[in-house]
Amino acid sequence: MRHIISILMENEPGALSRVVGLFSQRNFNIETLNVAPTEDATLSRLTVTTVGEDRVIEQITKHLNKLVDVVKLVDLTEGSHIERELMLVKVKALGAQRDEIKRTADIFRAQ
């Protein structure tokens, strides 16, 4: 089953390496990874998407919670949530092609 795990962690050098290293040590694949600082400059939010059985995910979350840098961990797939994808595309088109591309983009509410 696919899981989305949100990790609030200390914004320090090596913190990301320790979290990702835990996945690597357990021979566990990370499908997506996103890291960004929070409003509090001392903290970062790491969002990881991975696939695994519930008991394996539970084991990984227990190990993650033991890391010194991890402040809070939430498995977002346990509750109701909204998922979105983002794609950046650069297109060079003129005239009729440009209009057709805009119409296609409008179908998907692209900007």
Model-predicted regions and their roles:
Residues 1-111:
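A conserved regulatory-domain signal marking ACT and ACT-like small-molecule sensing domains
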